[in-house]
Amino acid sequence: MKYIGSCHCGNVKFEAEGEIASAMSCNCSMCQRKGSLLWFIPRSAMRLLTPDDNAGTYQFNKHVINHRFCLTCGIHPYAEGTAPNGDATAAINIRCLEGIDLDAIPVQHYDGRAH
């Protein structure tokens, strides 16, 4: 299935393709503050619909994940990084996807504080 996602103001917009079997709630210092529910897909399954420079990038801790946010409204719709197997990966904040029933998606909790 193809989903459209964006920040609040629409200056960062993308499409993501795949099936959302579950989402991840992480308690690391960043995710806890953002309140994201993450869906991981290959980076090749995500396509930006707006210019890349509409989004800022924030890194912390080990500096291996590019947390992307809208420079206008500040919403964090996705992040980019590398999976343990070396594949380019996108972490989509499913709260930013259109037409999603969050109550229908199982949520797995990840102890990001411990890692």
Describe these PLM feature segments.
Residues M1-H115:
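A short Gly-Trp-Pro
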